[in-house]
Regions:
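Residues that form or immediately flank small-molecule/cofactor binding pockets and catalytic motifs
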Residues: 49, 131, 167-170, 203-205, ...
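N-terminal Rossmann-like NAD(P)+-binding domain of SDR-like oxidoreductases, especially those catalyzing
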Residues: 1-164, 168
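C-terminal substrate-binding subdomain of Rossmann-fold SDR/epimerase-dehydratase oxidoreductases
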Residues: 192-320
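Short, flexible, glycine-rich and Lys/Arg-enriched loop motifs at helix boundaries
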Residues: 35, 166-184, 194-216
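Short secondary-structure boundary/capping segments
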Residues: 35-36, 123, 189-190, 234-235
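Short-chain dehydrogenase/reductase
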Residues: 87, 135-143, 178-186, 215-216, ...
Length: 320
């Protein structure tokens, strides 16, 4: 069962499951996902993870043996204005899901966590052991989610792992696009479509070109590691409690802007705006443990990420 399987990331996970010969059923409220993202062969149960009866019925009807939990409220900045909603969806929702799993004897979960659990780390390379210091209700809710899995494992023997990912971009198939109004790629593409100039917030950071450096990963690479984690849990093989899915090498915002201009053929000079408060110069993670256990690797270049995202965005904006 894939919660949030009609969303941008969840839909890629579902396709990776199908490509590996596994079956899936999706539970998604469709509050930010799209029914059109769901393959025809995959059952879609439209409903909330806060509905325990619906979850138990879905587990019974479809013979669910494990869960990949992608559903949740994912906007770190907005979570500051909506803390109760964030905790309800991400903490209460995860607890309700775990209760339904326990009631039906389902003992395997792959949890989509986030780099937001680290906050603003004071290190050039984030590892799984980097101190956790979330700085938003979203980051806090994801860390609590990891704790819920840990405590449930002690109490019931739940087999689990959490995948912490950073900036997810690109598209595995043109039909699946990132519609978030808060993520960098959609913001750039939206600005270009409206004839506006994309903005860079600060060009005076202590980085090679003065702009923020972040860890960008392709959504298809991320999806493959979710499937690898699920397969290891199915096989009873050991997994770490959490893995960072990082490249080990960051990309600057200026590099992304230049690649976007090259791919789209739209020449532009980004507008330089003041720094945003609390925006760190660099956040990059190692993916060594995930490479060892979860078939994790960066199979896609920055150009691949931009090209696939641009293609999917253009397709989504065309009239049907």
């Amino acid at each position: 069962m894939v919660t949030g399987g009609a969303g941008y990331i969840g839909a890629h996970v579902v396709r990776a499951l199908l490509d590996s010969g596994l079956k899936a059923v999706i539970v998604d409220s469709l509050s930010s996902g799209f029914a059109d993202f769901v393959p025809e062969s995959v059952p879609l149960v439209a409903g909330s993870i806060l509905d325990g009866d619906l979850l138990r019925d879905t587990i019974d009807e479809h013979g669910v043996t494990g869960v990949i939990h992608v559903a949740g409220y994912k906007y770190a900045g907005v979570s500051v204005q909506r803390p109760l909603h964030t905790y309800e969806q991400n903490v209460t929702g995860t607890a309700v899901l775990l209760r339904a799993m326990q009631d039906r004897g389902v003992d395997r979960m792959v949890f989509s966590s986030s780099a937001a659990v680290f906050g603003t780390p004071d290190t050039d390379l984030v590892t799984e052991n980097t101190p956790k210091n979330p700085q938003s209700p979203y980051g806090e809710s994801k860390l609590i989610g990891e704790w819920l899995l840990r405590d449930q494992a002690v109490a019931t023997g739940l087999r689990h792992t959490s995948l912490r990912y950073f900036n997810v971009v690109g598209s595995g198939v043109p039909e699946l696009f990132d519609a978030s109004p808060h993520n960098l790629f959609p913001l750039i593409f939206s600005a270009l479509a409206d004839g506006k100039t994309p903005r860079i917030f600060g060009d005076d950071y202590p980085t090679p070109d003065g702009t923020n450096v972040r860890d960008y990963i392709h959504v298809s690479d991320l999806a493959i590691s979710h499937v690898a984690a699920a397969r290891r849990l199915d096989a009873g093989l050991p997994l770490e409690p959490a893995y960072n899915l990082g490249s080990g090498d960051g990309v600057s915002v200026a590099e992304i802007m230049a690649t976007v201009a090259e791919v789209t053929g739209i020449a532009f000079e980004p507008e330089i705006a003041p720094r945003r408060a609390g925006d760190p110069a660099r956040i990059v993670a190692t993916g060594e443990l995930a490479a060892r256990d979860l078939d994790w690797s960066m199979r896609h270049s920055l150009r691949d990420m931009v090209e696939s995202a641009w293609k999917a965005t253009r397709r989504s904006s065309q009239p049907s």
